[in-house]
Amino acid sequence: KRLSRAIITILVTSLLLASTVFTPQTHAASSPRTGGAFYNYGEAMQKALLFYKANRLGDLPDDYILPYRTDAAMTDGQDVGLDLTGGWADAGDGIKFTHTISYAAGQLGWNVYEYREAFEKAGQLDVILDEIKWGTDFLLKAHPEPDVLYYMCGYNDSDHGYWIPHELLDVITDRKSFVLNPSTPGSDIAGITAGALAIASIIFEPTDPEYAEKCLKHAKEIFAFGDKYRGKNPLDVLYPSGSYLDDLAWGAIWLHIKTGDSTYLEKAKECLPTTSLGGGHTHCWDDVSYGAALKIAQVTHDEGYVAMVEKNLDWWMPNGGLTYSPGGLAWLSPWGSLRYAAVVA
């Protein structure tokens, strides 16, 4: 999905930012094999963040940075008496998924958590925090009660029948709202949403402690809901879930990192035991077990989780079991192959 590719672009560029000195000039991007001017990773990051702005839904300011964009999907939630506006549209469509918004906001937030200083050096810290907040503001709206989480606005039968600007979504398509509750569980969506909000509660603490506390409150409630009423979300065509245990582990470890509460750490390890993870995939929207294992390993220094992470990285190395293209790309899947290689890098 396009949204996921942009997420991974941010992840990789931020990894490189930590050792890069930024200047305001724009430098030509020549091949690193032949030398020449260096890549401007700060500009690459700025362009990747601009992609999210192009996909914003909701009430946009009159002086928006992209002048061709204006308010979109302003009726989201009206069918259930709520304001569910905001967030990002997904993958060139107009449907809004809580799952992928949570993954996107969580990945962007993880970057800030690990490389905040690099974003400051690039002059992009305020930009990425603003973009993350656009996503998390929607997630907070989508959780109006402790055991209620809205997971989708719009649906494929209506949305995929038209190729239209976002501004026409609620004029032409049906913006029906879909909900998770005790009778319709979705532990996968709840877990990854809790993770996104827990990360937000960490990264916003220095600049907006009141907002950070609000995110933490919702993260705890959403995690408790997903853990108590277990089951995969109802989606069977767009973003069907392979499992929910990885998402619960992801949410739990970030709640532990934020709160220091060992109950969350034990829950993360329970949902993701050291025997559960093979080598043959990587961190992505439908499988956050590798990211969860990495954070558990960093927190605990448990050799079992360290081995899980190293086994996965070994599989991605040349001659480790994965196909490599003639040009050197580690190739996992024909669908979004770059996102997988990029997140491992």
What are these regions (language model features)?
Residues 9-19:
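Bacterial N-terminal signal peptides
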Residues 37, 50-58, 105-122, 137-145, ...:
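Well-ordered alpha-helical scaffold segments within catalytic/enzyme domains
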Residues 87-101, 175-190, 231-246, 272-290, ...:
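Solvent-exposed loop and edge beta-strand segments that line ligand/cofactor-binding
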Residues 42-49, 55-89, 276-290, 297-345:
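Non-catalytic carbohydrate-binding regions of carbohydrate-active enzymes
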Residues 186, 190, 194-204, 212-257, ...:
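Aromatic-lined, polymer-binding surfaces characteristic
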Residues 48-60, 77-79, 131-147, 216-233, ...:
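Long, well-ordered core segments of solenoidal/helical folds
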Residues 28-99, 103, 134-181:
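Low-complexity, Ser/Thr/Pro/Gly-enriched N-terminal "stalk/linker" regions
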Residues 17-33:
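Sec-dependent signal peptide cleavage junction
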